[in-house]
Amino acid sequence: MLSTKLSLAECEKLMAEDHGDLNLSRSKVTSLPTGLTVKGDLHLWGSKIEELPKGLTVAGSLDLGYTEIEYLPDDLSVGSDLNLHSSKIKSLPKRLSVGGDLNLGNTEIKSLPDDLFVGGDLVLSYTAIKSLPDNLSVGKNLYLQDSEIKKLPRGLNVGGSLDLQWTEIESLLDDLSVGGNLYLQGSKIKKLPKGLTVGGDLSLSRTEIESLPDDLSVGKNLYLQDSEIKKLPRGLNVGGYLDLRDTKVKELPNGLHVGGDLDLRGTGVESIPDDLSIGCDLLLQDSHVSLVPNDTSIGGEIKWN
């Protein structure tokens, strides 16, 4: 039976029995020894621990979900994921470095430290955080869905996807580069910035955006269904699927290249430009197109029905 206050020797014995992990989830343990080093993961989910010891080092992941812990030690080091979801944590220490994902969902944290480093995902959904520090760097995905953040910081770098669904954010920074997907469904954004580069998918469904910038680059799929887009820029290059279903687009631009399917179902488009290039199928069900030029480059099939 575990004691409520573990010694280093007791912790080391438990870790030796569990391949380096220390699993105290839902346990009655109330304190950990100073200077504790966990070579694997430290699981404290739903435990009785109210404070972390000084000098705590976790080589793997640290799970503090549903704990009463309010503060993290200044010298905390986490090699992989840090889960604070639904914990009582009120603030983050300066110089906090998280090698993997940082989940702050459903916490009372109101701000992030200026020098925060997150190597994986940063989850801020359902938090009270209203602003992000300048030059924030997120190695993978940044989730802001249903957060109170109204503005993106200068120098923001997102290596993966940026999720702004149903946020109050009204504008994006010029030359914003998103390595993964950019989700804007239901957001307040009305215009896309110059120099926007999206390595993955771009979704503008249920937004008030009416046009796309001339230099827009989308590496994978572009979803425009249920958007207010009326016109596409000349020379638009979409690496994957271009979804124009039920949009207000009535004309395709010259130089349009679509690497995947081009979906014109339910649109007012009547003609296909001679230089259109499609990597896969051309979907024309319920469209106004009656003729496709013979020299149109189509890698797949033309589907009328």
Language-model segments: residues:
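Hydrophobic anchor residues at the C-terminal helix/turn of individual leucine-rich repeat
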Residues: 35-36, 53-56, 75-76, 96, ...
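N-terminal capping/linker segments that flank leucine-rich repeat
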Residues: 1-31, 296-305
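Short linear motifs in low-complexity, proline-biased tails and propeptides
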Residues: 290-296
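Charge-rich, low-hydrophobicity low-complexity segments
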Residues: 1-12, 17, 51, 145, ...
